[in-house]
């Protein structure tokens, strides 16, 4: 485990950084006292915590550029932060760095109903975009479970999805243009509101880059018309494999639902006790399948989905009869994470993906892992695109439980890759999945990622120590395990 920086060295570095940033930020926009930085010591992955030297809260793009230029000159790491709802430790502060909060970049700059676009600052909440577009009969499609709080800047950084991403796509499919600043404080703008095929797709590179390439300050996003009607099917299954086969069956039938989600029995019990959505507590698994469009389209698709689900062994099928019932069906899925927080002191949410045909296999494997690691796990996930969200329940105050939880999570990710999947679908790598990158990618592939990182950030100051494994890490996997969010030898050369 790394030794903490001597207190006097850290204090001296903080004094230097605060003195350098004070001329470029108002006094109220620079926090450095211990009690002021506590709210920024972690993101949604609360098991790992670290206080930054200081927190910068710029209000203008000029201030963002000035903070970045100053930190670049001093060689100070910078970790950009949106709402801090991420689940992989992507916004975990650097103990000798500055956290750059975009919380004050919260203005919706324009909503254009004719072009069906919205131009927003990066600190705007995901749901606020849909609220602003609602008077025009439009909304923003990507809808992560944290949409009431998460920001568009964080969504861009993680390439977030949501329960409706199967039909409407991830963030990368719904963003037209991004604006931001490099680590040297230079403005960059990628993408266009018009068809843009010239050059390399640098916007595609920036979306999902986890704050490692640039700091996003603004985005132009697509808006889509609200459907005339949406209805949801809730299907119960007495066997996990039947439920998994039903997911594959729906897609194989040529149906692309607006949403196709799955919950296992432990998760169903947790959310039903929390929101009383009317779930079947005797079911081993529940599927939520949504159709939207014109009334005629919805009626036909609902009938087709119900037929497939019944053929695959559903023991009960309920169809929402009005908007209130549809929202009640979805309330359990949307509240899965807070419901889990009610039954466990802590949880760690994995985010691997799996081919749909292997859903039952991975869920049964996770059940065996529960016995191996002596920890409970509740499963909820985007079944339509095979994006798993197993929530491992544990107590972070118990070091042994945390260690077993980390091993459990790594086992899920490795098994997912072995079954043809990936280590993350939308939550990002952060620090949580750093080891597991070596399971999915070769040293040569990691070298290409590192080379791209250096092209944007030669000093490697933006969100360092995350996403890309350290040099030779793939060969050393198992000897350099991330524990409690800390990495031995954090300053080792990266590829």
Predicted segments with their positions:
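C-terminal substrate-recognition/cap domain of FAD-linked oxidoreductases
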Residues: 31-41, 221-225, 231-408, 415, ...
